[in-house]
Amino acid sequence: SIICALCGVGCAGFSKQPIFTEIIGEEAEPVKIVKTARMENNAVQMFFSGTAEFLSAEIFIPETGETQTCSVEPMDIPNDFTDSEGKSGKVDTYTAFALTPTAPIGIGAPFVLRGSVSDTKHSVLDFALPFEGANTRPAKLRITEIRPLYSSKPKSEFIEFIVMESGNLSGITITNVGDKQNPHYQFPAAEVSAGETIVYHWRSVEEGIRDELTAKTISGGTQSCPAARDFWGPYTSIPKRNANVILIKAGVNGDIQDAILYCTEKEFAKRGAAHAWNDE
C-alpha cells in the first residue's frame, strides 16, 4: 500500500499545507502525520498516529535545488500531547521523531523536509513539508505612529515603527485583532539596524511598490517613505475600522513586542471623548 503527500505549488514554490493522497488496502490503517513543529535550531518535530518507521529523510532547498542530509532521532511523546486539531489520545498511539538538518539554513530561507515512513502493515507515506529557516536574531520594534483610516487612493493605511534592537525581521508578525479573515502579516527576511524606521503599508494599491529588503532597495509608489524602509501588505481592501487592537509579536505565537488600541471617532463620541482622524 502506498500513500503520497505532495505540496501544492504556491508563490514560493510550495503551499503552506501538504496535500495528502491515499491509496491503501481495505484492511490497512496507515500511519498519518498529525502534527509538525519547526524548532529554533531548524529541527522539525514530526508526530504520527500509529507506529511509524523512517525509510528516508532529506532537506531540499528550493532556491538552489540542493539537497542536504538530516539526522533522525526518536522522541518521547509528552503526556499532555495534542495534535494539530487539538485532539489528544493515549501516548502509545503516537510515534514522534526529531529531524535535524546537518548544515546551516539561513534565516527565513525556504526549505522542504521530505522523506518516507512506513507503518506496521508496510504502508508507505511519502511527505514533503515546507518551512522557513528560524529567525535566531529577531529585531525588536516599537510602534511610533499608526494611520488606520484613509478615504481615498492611493493613500494606504500604515503603521510606523522604530527598530529598538538590530536583527532580522523574518517572521515578526503584525496581528490585526479586529480582522477575522486576514489577521496576520509576517515580515519577510530583512536585516535592520537599531534606529532605523520601518513603515508597514496595509494595502498594495499602486504599481512599482516593493518591499525594501535591504537599505539599498528603493520602493516606488507615492506613499513610500524616503527616510524609512517600506513594506507592503498583500491586501487591497480597507482594514477594519471599528475599535481595534494591533499586536507586534516575534512570530504568530511569539512574545509581544508592542501593542496599540485605537477607536473611530464614533466610538470615541459614544464614550464622551472627541477625536477625529484627519485625512492628511
Role assignments for model-derived ranges:
Residues S49-S56, E165-L169:
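Short proline/glycine-enriched turn/loop motifs at strand-loop junctions of beta-rich domains
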Residues G106-I107, A189, A194-E280:
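Solvent-exposed beta-edge/loop recognition patches
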Residues P101-P110:
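Surface-exposed, short loops/turns at beta-strand junctions within beta-sandwich domains
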Residues N79-T100, T197:
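Aromatic sugar-binding surface patches on proteins
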Residues S1-A12:
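Sec-dependent bacterial lipoprotein signal peptides
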Residues Q45-S49, E160-I162:
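Short edge beta-strand/loop segments characteristic of extracellular beta-sandwich folds
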Residues E53-D76, I172:
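Short, surface-exposed alpha-helix to beta-strand junction/turn motifs within ectodomains of secreted
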Residues F14-K35, M39, S123-G178, Y235-N242, ...:
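A structural motif detector for short, solvent-exposed N-terminal "entry" segments of globular domains
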